[in-house]
Amino acid sequence: MIPRYTREEMGHIWSERNEFDTMLLVETLASEAQAELGVIPKEAAKTIREKGNFDVERIHEIEKETNHDIISFVTAVGEYVGPEAAKYIHLGLTSTDVKDTALGYMMKQACDILIDDLKRLHEVLRRRAAEFKYTPMIGRTHGIHGEPTTFGLKLALWMAEVERDIERMEHARKSVAVGKLSGAVGTYSNIDPFVEQYVCEKLGLEPVKIATQVVQRDRHAELLSTIAVVGGTLDKIALEIRHLQRTEVREAEEYFSPKQKGSSAMPHKRNPITCERICGMARLLRGYAQSAYEDQALWHERDISHSSVERVILPDATIALNYMLHLTIRTIDKLLVYPETMLKNLNLTGGLVFSQTILTHLVDKGAVRDEAYRWVQKHAMERWLEGKDFATGLKADENIKKYMTDEEIDACFDPYKLLKHVDTIMARFGL
């Protein structure tokens, strides 16, 4: 991922140095397990632990000749520990024993950051949902005014989705926080299963029940799919804020700092650039998920077609989502909200948004629903097309007069009556 979208902690996990450090840790732990079994001398394991190191440039130099990254890594480490201990590094292992176990450890760390980010987003949504619990606004369906809701309910809806995202990410973490040290085709042909158990336990990983040369890639696909779904949540939130920030709507908008500029040409502009960035990056995440699905099918006990893909999508997807979550947390925390504009827009249609309330009242009073629907719709369309007053038309309708008084009609135009169950909904979240 480009530095512009990389936050330090997540970027460190996927740095080349950290990847090699993690691989060295796997090799070191494997040698310790082998020493416990009596397969290699304890002194050799001690030397590997104390002297094990590498030079990244040296690894690259060796790889130019070997064209094999793991062999180059093992050779470079061997130069630090000396020939006597070097012959015991990587004993009984295949490259992906080290690579996949290190990758599982790194993915676990990345998931931990993402889960923490999601929890922080949940908290800021919860705080702002409580703040705007009773703030009325128009609810829109198909982009058209529907019925009143509250801005707090909108925020609570997002909060509920983030709760599910946390559960999804925790499940994905469990799926990828695994390791395998079972040899060339997964049969432990030249290594004792104890080594796998020992290494995984030290790293906080779960040994896979069965593997080929590699950990199966449905696990990685699940993580990338989860990342894409979480990205979809952030996309949804950002897209809604963008709509609410439209000039003709302006019910909410991103924070705009005093020295911020919106356009190189138009000094008046206040653009939702952060939300636009979130929406754009969500597209990347969906593309990464598709690539992960393609990685699931490998030849026989393993081919290497997945490797080049994962070198891009795993760092990029986790780094991108980490950055997007940071942007979303900041956006919600500083979101500018305009309750007066919300109320003005709620009344924009002259009461059309209470048409269902009128219809329901008529049916409750004994009117046939289809007939009542036609009566109310007639006056609604006159409001839409001719600008006639909706309430006046209803009160003058002889059919409606049979069932409702003018006072009863007026009472139907109270938005707060339609929001009487807000407390019930919010109580589900402890708000």
Language-model-detected regions and their locations in the chain:
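Generic, well-ordered alpha-helical scaffold segments in large soluble proteins
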Residues: 33, 76, 80, 110, ...
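Short, well-ordered beta-strand elements within core beta-sheets of diverse protein domains
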Residues: 153, 221-229, 357-365
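Conserved hydrophobic residue
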Residues: 40, 249-250, 368
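Glycine-rich cofactor/substrate-binding loops
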Residues: 1-22, 62-66, 266-431
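Short amphipathic alpha-helical segments with heptad-repeat character
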Residues: 108-115, 119, 126, 156-159, ...
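A helix-coil-helix interface module used to build multimeric assemblies
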Residues: 1-182, 188, 192-198, 207, ...
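Acidic, glycine-rich loop-and-beta core segments that form the ion-binding/anion-interacting portion
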Residues: 196-289
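Conserved helix-loop functional segments at active or binding sites
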Residues: 131-134, 168-171, 175, 205-209, ...
